Curated annotation (Swiss-Prot):
Compartments (UniProt record): Cytoplasm
Any one of the GO CC terms: cytosol
Keywords: Cytoplasm, Lipopolysaccharide biosynthesis, Nucleotidyltransferase, Transferase
Name of the protein this chain belongs to: 3-deoxy-manno-octulosonate cytidylyltransferase
Pfam families from the UniProt entry: CTP_transf_3
Amino acid sequence: MTHPPPFIAVIPARLASTRLPNKPLADLGGKPMVVRVAERAREAGAQQVLVASDAQSVLDAARDHGFEAVLTRADHPSGTDRLAEVAAAFGWRDDTVVVNVQGDEPLIDPVLVRDVASHLAAHPACAIATAAHPIHDAADVFNPNVVKVALDAQSVALYFSRAPIPWSRDAYQPHWPDVAAMPAPAFPVYRHIGLYAYRARFLRTYPSLAQAPIEQAEQLEQLRALWHGERIAVLITESAPEAGIDTPADLARVQALFQPGSK
């Protein structure tokens, strides 16, 4: 087995979730959610796992289970900004690979985390790596909550959008705007997976980058990097990852998986 290059996993976690308050501390089989996520990051082979939060209760929960935790400001507009604060505080080398593991994804596959980190290490011209998988359902292509990514010949991101990209003129135009009548895509359409690996150099510069008009329009923060000329390498996987936890119903579904005897 080939060992992955060294990488650091940072788990940004905040309590102020509008749909699910205190989400990082939700119990999953006797452990807080943020700890379950940290365990997945450790299984991925991260040389360092950090929980980053503005809430002392989250830091205490992580430390009680043997994980390193760091206090961050409460006014960060995104998880990337929180990572940027951590990168600046620790003074990591420019080429250090830092993976943002979302704090509400306790079922994330450690192999995917490791592979995205390795993908960035293998693409020195890129500042960021992420992942995507093929879409086979036309409903997903036209769903604005499903973010699509268009790629170049080297699987580097050209653009991310909530709109259906690429638009197939011949396949879609005859049916527009009847989305229900749209055929399944006969060409590669990729759904973006919100897992990112960054070079520490980029994280330190990120807070100084002005927001991009396309970022504000689409409400996709990764477009800021493209707008400012950074390259994003995209790892193609065959299937979608397990969904994260956003609502009480999501939490109940995942809690059931952590019950004794569940598979």
